[in-house]
Swiss-Prot record:
Pfam families: Asp-Al_Ex, TrkA_C
UniProt domain RCK C-terminal: residue ranges: 190-272, 274-355
Annotated localization: Cell membrane
The protein's name in its UniProt record: Uncharacterized transporter CE2102
Topology versus the membrane: Multi-pass membrane protein
Membership in a protein family: Belongs to the AAE transporter (TC 2.A.81) family.
Record GO terms (molecular function): monoatomic cation transmembrane transporter activity
Organism: Corynebacterium efficiens (strain DSM 44549 / YS-314 / AJ 12310 / JCM 11189 / NBRC 100395)
Amino acid sequence: MSIFVENQLLALVAIMGIGLLLGRIRFFGFRLGVAAVLFVGLAFSTIEPDITVPPLIYVVGLALFVYTIGLEAGRDFFRSLRSTGLRNNGLALGAIIATTAIAWVVIKALGLAPATGAGMLTGALTNTPAMAAVVDALPALIDDNPTDAARILELPVVAYSLTYPLGVLVVILTIAVCGGLFKVNHEKEAKNAGVAVQELTGRRVRVTRDDLPAISNIPELLDLEVIVSRVERRGQHDQFIPEEGDRTRLGDILTVVGSDDELERAVGLLGEFVDGHPYSDIDLDYRRIFVSDESMVGVPLAKLRNRIPGMLITRIRRGDTDLIAHPDMTLQLGDLVRVVAPAERIKEATHIFGDSYKRLADFNLVPLVVGLSLGVLVGMMEFPLPGGSALSLGNAGGPLLIALLLGAMGRTGKVVWQIPYSANLALRQLGITMFLAAIGTTAGAGFRSALSDPASLLIIGVGALLTLVISVLVLVIGHKVMRIPFGETAGILAGTQTHPAVLSYISEASRNELPAMGYTSVYPLAMVAKIIAAQVLLFLLI
């Protein structure tokens, strides 16, 4: 192992590579995914405590991960605040308060040192800023004896390092076990929540009602997840694309695009099904086009339509998901849009949207760097708390907060904050892998000493118990009592723990966006709540 001690880069690459390989192997029916990198790092540093990874790797990886998550989830996050955000945050906050109260009772009963108990809670809740806040608060609460002060300041750090690894593993195992016990069907959950990957098709419908709203308003006013892409009218030889304000007439044949379930509803509300191929007209054509022109990004489709008269965006493919185009939606770099237009204007449509895969790969990095810099600066800001300590969002909370704001904005003038979907996923995966490899090497020495120290084993055991408590509380109350989809509930738990490895695991298991929605909806409040909870616990114990 000496070669890894001497070469930190080799150690980092080896931990990442072995962890990613092990993460693809199934153990007892589930895979750890990228979370396996954490445990490989822990194993390396337990065997040889001198194996280290530069702290900057941990910071950069964490900042990259949360920033790319925030960019992708920004718009949905602020939309959720008006619907499910209060519910999700109430669940997370209640679980943190309950776990802190249980920790106080257990620590008092076992007679653990206050600094050790507070550090143990931060490890069980896997929150580094909370541990740092405890260390910051200690000098004002202990005697002036330098020897005692130095020893006491080490206690929360040691307790944190002992409880942190199981603080991750217990959560992942609890999610895996509860998912099996609850017989979770992730695909069905995603479909019910409207985030599933669904195949979109077209169907011809003859209008038999004379009281329908304007064609562009049909989806909203009739609560249909569809779009009308073409109209056939008696007396007109060709199909035409409906413009803003156009209305239907009796006997019109509409080409309606949507999922099978929504198309069944549309037929019932609009008229009757008409047999025949919906795209048979030779004068109208369609094409899938890559969005690589930045001028088309971050602008609502309702406004964008003025730039493409006579054309219609009917579908947007983002990642593996096909979405029906809605007036309030915005395009992102890398989206694959389906455009309906007169056959002679298809080439013009291709030019308007860019359709350059090479240009996508050569995206502008300046907004990414500026956004990350703003996030780090916000994370450095300190907010005073009672007792002389201060609260800061750190290198996770700051970038996440800024990313959520920029992701919701999409663009500022000519600056596009979003990055291509594929680049976002690549940076996200790289960031979480770097973070887990680095953080895993920090706790090995403490784990090694714990193997022969009964007191350390007690701290590990109690920390694991606290982690189990908060995991069960969130999963059972969230899914069984509050009827939140299990994938979203597990995401809420990952956000409550503020640990990306948990999110990565459940996202890989569910293969939909529900976990990310739950994670981003509670992460900022959970980060602040745990920092305050750890310090309050310390004050109550002393």
